[in-house]
């Protein structure tokens, strides 16, 4: 009975605490999210916490970290909590940097790439380095990401630096001071997550079934590129991927690997609009048309570890032209 009484007391205390947080506007919205297996909050707001006693404002919006999604994808908590202590990142890494975090600023901790492997202990990963690792190692991502690098502009930053507009200046100030109540933090995070909408993919039926590449037909017959088949395959591979859904926030983005360096569009210009048959003397760094085709096709196949067609077998993609009777 003692154990039973203790359990009842613990349950009563937990319910009372939950009621208090709900009364303060804390966990009501957060409860709408699926709970994590670890017991950590399903989502939290990561504020740019600084060392200054009363900082004013911040250069960037806070980041809402969806702990639930990441927990499902990562086997070991120490992948992110590399010290083994599951505390907030800003405990050691602040805007200015502090001794506890080897003076590595919050910005570096979240965005650093090419992190050197530690001789002992866990090698830290940043948000950006982990995402980049995923796009390089997973076949469904590597095909495109092996040949293009996303432009790191304001739109790229806003994928993560995005929070509900209902957050007040007072809450922002408390957040960067490190004094925002956990319940209020989780409520803001949940509201942001619940407001996110998945971008509807473009229908493959809008794309050409085949594209005849004949601009360079000479020794070989025109190449019949199975455009819709390639597009459908790519879409099928990433349709349920949360990382792709987050960064492919416009349906045309999937087209932008091949149809690069032009405005996002479902009707992009032809490759020959920019790439000429001969090297353009005014733009010597721009590949000619034949090089552009082969860099794209072979680069994607290599990134996805596609065994066929082989780079050395020209007739797999375009048959040899019949020899003239002469």
From Swiss-Prot:
Heme 5 binds at residues 111, 157, 160-161. This is Nine-heme cytochrome c. GO terms for molecular function: electron transfer activity; heme binding; metal ion binding. May form part of a transmembrane redox complex through which electrons are transferred to the cytoplasm for reduction of sulfate. It comes from the Bacteria. Keywords: Electron transport, Heme, Iron, Metal-binding, Periplasm, Repeat, Signal, Transport. Heme 7 binds at residues 260, 271, 274-275. Heme 8 binds at residues 230, 297, 300-301. Heme 6 binds at residues 227, 255, 258-259. One of its GO terms (cellular component) is periplasmic space. Its main location: periplasm. Binds 9 heme groups per subunit. CDD domains: Cytochrom_C3. Heme 2 binds at residues 82, 89, 92-93. It is found in: Periplasm.
